Structures are given as C-alpha cells and as structure tokens.
Amino acid sequence: MYIVSMFGLAGLEALICFIFLFLFSFLTSFKASAQNPFYLNHDCPNRTTYSSNSTYSTNLKTLLSSFASRNASYSTGFQNIRAGQTPDRVTGLFLCRGDLSPEVCSNCVAFSVNESLTRCPNQREAVFYYEECILRYSHKNFLSTVTYEGELIMRNPNNISSIQNQRDQFIDLVQSNMNQAANEAANSSRKFSTIKTELTSLQTLYGLVQCTPDLARQDCFSCLTSSINRMMPLFRIGARQFWPSCNSRYELYAFYNETAIGTPSPPPLFPGSTPPLTSPSIPGKSGNSTVLVVAIVVLAVLLFIALVGYCFLAQRTKKTFDTASASEVGDDMATADSLQLDYRTIQTATNDFAESNKIGRGGFGEVYKGTFSNGKEVAVKRLSKNSRQGEAEFKTEVVVVAKLQHRNLVRLLGFSLQGEERILVYEYMPNKSLDCLLFDPTKQTQLDWMQRYNIIGGIARGILYLHQDSRLTIIHRDLKASNILLDADINPKIADFGMARIFGLDQTQDNTSRIVGTYGYMAPEYAMHGQFSMKSDVYSFGVLVLEIISGRKNSSFDESDGAQDLLTHTWRLWTNRTALDLVDPLIANNCQNSEVVRCIHIGLLCVQEDPAKRPTISTVFMMLTSNTVTLPVPRQPGFFIQSSPVKDPTDSDQSTTTKSTPASIDDELITDLYPR
C-alpha cells in the first residue's frame, strides 16, 4: 500500500510497464546476441593467390585461429596480429563496433573467421564486412596505414526532400554533426564516437564513426571525413560507408546501442581450449538457462528497488535544474557565501572608488581597478543605482556566472551587497579589451598574425563552452571587440553577459520584443525581427573574425570606400578573388596566406544571411583546428536597412536599443561583465 500511495495507481502501472519493457528488451538483446552476425559484403581481389599447402596458408590459419581463440582482445573490440616471416608473413586484424559487448564481438569474429576461407578460398588479401565487425588480412603490412580500397557503400531507400533548400539544410546538418563525431573519434583512444542530435521535435539524427585504433589521430580524421563526404551526394535520409580502415553511418533512427556506449566491459571467461579453425566456438549459444533466469530476476528486483529509491528521493528534494526563477535564485544565493566579499574590503581596494582608479564605464555602471591587501589586482564593477540591471538579474548573475569556469571567459571572483550598493568583482585584465589594441593606430603593432589567430581560436573556444560544453546553454547576444578582454599574454576572454539568455534543454531559438545590442554585430534576423539563437552568436563571431584580420571596425567604412560596411567590402573582395586585400597591412608580410584566406572563408560562412546556412560553433572550431575539413562555398552575407536606432547615451561603444514592438524590460538578463 505504501508503494501505491507513493506513486499512485497510474504511476504504479507505469512502473510495472517500464519493468516489463526493460525485461523484454533485455531478453530480446540476449537472444539477438546469440544470433549469427549479419553479413554485409566482402572484398578479396584476385591479384595474388596462395596454394592450400603453402607456408602462407599455414600462417593464415594460425592468425585466424588466434582471432577465434578465447584469448583474443574482445574486451577492447580490436586486435591486430602478424604471423610468419617474409615473404609468407600474414598481417590481420578484427574490429568490432564500439557499442557492442565482448560476447557479441567474439561471436562475430568467430563466425567471420569460419566463413572467411569459404568466401575467399585462395586470395592473399581479403576484408569481410559484417553488421557487428570487420575482419581483414593481407600479405602486405597495412597496420597504422589508411586503406581506401575495398569500399562498401549502403544507402537508406528513402530520399531526402526534393525541395532544394530543405535538402541542402539536411545535408549541412548531417555533415556538420558527423564531422564533429569524426573529430571526437580521432582524438579518442578507441577511435570511436557516436552522435545524437534532435533535428526537429519529431526527428532525431543518429550517427556513428569508427577507425581502427592503430591509426594516428590525423589519419583517422582524414579517413572519416572522406567517408562522410562519400555519403553526402547520395541525398538519402540514411547511409553507411566502409573502408577497411574506417567506417561511418547516419540514420533517423537509433541503430546502435545507446546504453552500451562507454568503456567496454572485461572479457568473458570462456570454457574449453582454443577451438579448431574449421569449427570455431561461438560463445553465447551454450549458456546455462538457470543462470540466465536468476540473473534476470535479480536484475529486475534491483531495478525496482532503484526506481523506488529514486522516486522517493525525488519526492524529498523536488529540485529542478532548469532556468532558475527569481525566488529560486534568491534561495541559491545562500550557497554563494564563498563568493561574498566584505564591502569595506572592496572600498579599500579601490581607494574608496577613486576617480583615478576608474578604468571603464558603461550602461550598467562604472568599473574600477582594485588591489587587495595580498597584492591581487581585480576589476570592480559598481552598478549604478538607476541601472537597468535589477535585483533578480544581479542575483542570477552571481549564481549562474560563478558556475561558468573556462579559460576564455572572464571569471567572476565575488560580489558584495551593502544597502543599495551592488558590486561585482572580476579578474583583472591588464590589456583591457580587444578594441583598445586592434583599432588604435599606436597599439595595432602589438598584434601580429599569430596573436590574432590565437585570439580567433580562443573566442571560438569560449563560445563553444557557452553553447555546448557548459551545464547551461547560454546565448551571449552581444559579442563584439569591446567585450573581448585580453590577459597579460594576449589570451582572449569573453566578457559582458548583460544581454545573455539561458536556453532550455530542447530550445534552439527565442524571440524578444526589445532588441538590444550593437549594430554591425547583430544578425539580421535579430536586428529586424528579434529572433536570436546560437546562430546569431555565430554571426557576431564572423564579424569579429573579419575585424581581427582587417584591423578595421565594421562601422569604419563610408562611401569613399565603395562599401557601406566591412561585410560588403569583404564579400566584394572575395567574389573578385582578391581576398588578401582585406588583410591589415601591418601583418600582410608576416602571415601565411592560406591560413588567412581560410579564416576569411570561415568568417564569411558565419555571416551568411540565412541562419540555417551558418555553421555551428563546434563546426567552426573544427574548421579552425583542422585543415582537412572541407569548407562549403559561402553565400552572400546578411544585409539589412538600418532604421534610426535609439542610442544609449551611457554606452561609449554605441550599443543600441531598438523597439520593434511595444517594449518590455530585458527579461532573463543573466550578467554583465565589464566593460560596457
């Protein structure tokens, strides 16, 4: 009765249903694991052969027997072996799909070994493709080398929409997500990665990529990106491509085992001795049924207890981790005691907020340089009493921004509440903001090309953290040169989150009736319609990239330049194939032309008018860090007619506020890092 009262009848029924489905799934997967592997294809070119009584034949049988033995590396899903001596040496490997158990792996390898000499009876080299594994051997030493022969391409029977725009958008999404998975796989020890991305509320993209783990990082990445590129022209909603060295697949349904992704379990203990080559043992078919039943019962009981305990704890805590309301933020402030600073300490550090210590001023207050008694230098933002940043926003800033820890974000060190005083303390940036160096003729020489390239990459890393890698998904909405601060080593740190918004778990865009930001950096869809998303941040990043390369403000152009802004100027140079004319003359003779042109290309991709055409920041970061990623052709940048904005007289960087519809207060502002 306690359980019924705790869950309710409907909840209890749901729980029983869940357990039933779990057991059904478990039994189904157990049964499936004992089935024969699903054969896809094989390739055994008839270029060279061997006789049945030759030394090569003996070496091959030795190698295959090793793969089918109980001592094979089923737990890692990969093994390579060389048997014999030159010229009769045989090199071989097996590779199991990274989401499968050691039992399924051993079953597939043993099965493929048993079939190999039937499918390719006398060929010296062969590769066998199964749903669960790949088996390969050759008289050549192919280890740690990418092989682009023996290709297998399979396609989903369903085509993508015949509408050109929808088709291109789908392909772009698939390619960017699969390339991200390829990058993750190449940088992992197992050379394996999966992706799961919601395309719409009804469609989810699943992807899987894998290399043989003996490949170097760059070789794996090159193989996978080539594999992915081979699938894109098929224009299908799903496809897979195999080479002996790597393979990739995407579908709109879950084709891999999501629950098994992770560190492989230890290899099972198989009874008996090494099986003969002609009849390798297939583990899993002789299991003890009594043990299986006991295991299922115990598993079900443990699952039930775990669910009851979880629900009981959930009833006790009733705590959500989504965007906090003002009252919740107020409660959480109690947990931020470690960040709360004594007002008098800050007052002393800034010499009572002396005018000589003032280093910046913006719409939300003034910024002072301070020095604590231990010698630590800090930046102190003192919010003005008539600031638009209210009590709830201030609390949200302390609670949320304190959790954003990244080397390319300015760090919040503490806060203080004293009467009407609202003070925020940040790490001090001795080189101030990017615009102070980039657009100052006397200081521009401090930024050579390598430093500018490092700044571009650092900004991308910071945005990637906000959009994808942090616990919260945060849209900055005001990325510009004055909001990129530089530390003592000219490393960039994103600042000023006063206009930022938190997105929910499944949220991809939002709208606002009060458009705030800086013209020239605003994406067209935001400036004209109040629509913002991760892609609007990408647009602002693209403008920053072009400013960093050219050393010119987006707003510094006039009619004498023959262009209204930096984007128009860049686009004309690009279409005239004179992109290098954009480069700041101060660095033109000390930079790699190919690297600069690639950055210009990336910048133009980011500022395309259609948000769907812009790459995600993760794709941008991959483009910046790997020259093997193919860049698509950029479309024309976003252009829009600027209405007469209402300038904020307190903002020295000409941030603007445009009222597109009856205005409301800036809802859900997160924080405001100096300077403004």
From Swiss-Prot:
Compartments where found: Membrane
Coiled-coil intervals: none
Extracellular side: 35-291
Record carries keyword DNA-binding: no
Topology in membrane: Single-pass membrane protein
Key words of the record: ATP-binding, Glycoprotein, Kinase, Membrane, Nucleotide-binding, Phosphoprotein, Receptor, Repeat, Serine/threonine-protein kinase, Signal, Transferase, Transmembrane, Transmembrane helix
Residue(s) carrying Phosphotyrosine: Y426, Y526
Segments for region (Disordered): 640-666
Residues carrying Phosphothreonine: T518
Record GO terms (molecular function): ATP binding; protein serine kinase activity; protein serine/threonine kinase activity
E.C. number: 2.7.11.-
Protein kinase domain span: 353-639
Compositionally biased intervals (Low complexity): 652-662
Catalytic activity: L-seryl-[protein] + ATP = O-phospho-L-seryl-[protein] + ADP + H(+); L-threonyl-[protein] + ATP = O-phospho-L-threonyl-[protein] + ADP + H(+)
Positions annotated with a glycan in the UniProt record: N46, N53, N71, N114, N159, N187, N257, N288
Protein name: Cysteine-rich receptor-like protein kinase 8
Record lineage: Eukaryota, Viridiplantae, Streptophyta, Embryophyta, Tracheophyta
